[in-house]
């Protein structure tokens, strides 16, 4: 039976939820891959179903955002006794929730969400809660998922990885691989075109590793590095085909309509076909950067673009180029790509640069960049290619960090190799007016195995109301020092603020909760 006439599969939400639990419960990469591959075979050859399953097990919704925040997930109805929800039906429910708009939208979304949870079993509710809350960390992310797709389809993992890198969308690649289009990934030239670099289709962006300082960055790049100012704006990927410009976020969402300034700047360039990396940023009259949140506000779904442009226009700075008028530059060295960019983009729309082997010169460049209000520098290897979709060693970020002493309010049980350990900590800042603690974020980053053992014992002692649930509430007594990249506005937490990239440095047994940083100290970083 050909794929086009094969009977389409029915997969229940329960099947995905149990697979997720199984994957989260094993530290074995091979076992994770095998479990996911088995589920994907069941979903095949239904391309849409495969794409949904891959998205969910990667911790993402097909719809990206559906307007459901932390507050909406705090309570849920009693669970259903038996599983009846199909994956397709739940995906349709997500789409319906995301489409709600206008007066009474919040109440309507809440009603739809309640109906969905009421039809879900306890296992399914737990999965939905973690998926919608952004807490689905189970190791079933890009690398493992790509291997699982390859195993399920019987094709090389490298083919899947490259297709996902260039297509920018692993669910779409999985759908093609498991719906009879595997030739598109394994070598037939006519089909392979579907997953090559193409103007108008976003590419998974290259990401940076971290270096402790400029001297380390120079050493890791072989004795010389290209330093660039790291702007605290919003990364954008810009595509141009003739007079058509499309702008994507780093998560590959199309935001063209919200960023007319980027479109105008791109149309002014002497080029017909372009894929470029850039940074959109709100600047003050003196060209110093506005707070990150000012830039981020332009990316909201309900933004009044005309009013926003009039109130605070955005500027765009280009820092890399992937394609120019028929020439793919992904595999070209950094120096060649930057030369192509310099020939195309005016200096006023380029980030400041310094090519040097001298740590002192690099240090002065970093200091000047920070003095200008930017967040740090990027150090790039002169000979490195553009490693789309990877946190490549060719890019290193160097920036100062802020530290806060916060109080642990609750802890979540871990999964995978952290199964049986209290892992993800809820962080609170002290409210000097009430003496209470205001939640401002969560983190599981920076914890060593020894730290996990210690905090499991410590927070078991501090637990309030038992340790049987997924989230263990604790007495607010333990102070922890965390490093953060900054703070942003957020409706997710009661304090209205959220920490950016928080990671644990150490527990401060020398400090009591009364010595923890206040919510005012957190606001000062905003």
UniProtKB/Swiss-Prot annotation:
Q: What class of enzyme is it?
A: ligase
Q: Which Enzyme Commission number(s) are listed?
A: 6.5.1.1
According to UniProt, the reaction catalysed is: ATP + (deoxyribonucleotide)n-3'-hydroxyl + 5'-phospho-(deoxyribonucleotide)m = (deoxyribonucleotide)n+m + AMP + diphosphate
This protein's UniProt keywords = ATP-binding, Cell cycle, Cell division, DNA damage, DNA recombination, DNA repair, DNA replication, Ligase, Magnesium, Metal-binding, Nucleotide-binding
- Catalytic-site annotation from UniProt: 230 (n6-amp-lysine intermediate)
What cofactors does this protein use?
Answer: Mg(2+)
Instruction: Identify a single GO molecular function assigned to this protein.
Output: metal ion binding
Q: What PROSITE patterns does the entry give?
A: DNA_LIGASE_A1, DNA_LIGASE_A2, DNA_LIGASE_A3
Concerning SUPFAM superfamilies, the annotation shows: ATP-dependent DNA ligase DNA-binding domain (SSF117018), DNA ligase/mRNA capping enzyme, catalytic domain (SSF56091), Nucleic acid-binding proteins (SSF50249)
Q: Where does ATP bind?
A: 228, 235, 250, 279, 319, 391, 397
Q: Which Pfam families does this UniProt record tie to the protein? A: DNA_ligase_A_C, DNA_ligase_A_M, DNA_ligase_A_N
Q: Which GO terms describe its biological process?
A: cell division; DNA biosynthetic process; DNA recombination; DNA repair; DNA replication
Record's function text: DNA ligase that seals nicks in double-stranded DNA during DNA replication, DNA recombination and DNA repair.
Matching HAMAP family, A to Z? DNA_ligase
As for family, the record states: Belongs to the ATP-dependent DNA ligase family.
The protein's name in its UniProt record: Probable DNA ligase
Q: What gene name is listed for this protein? A: lig
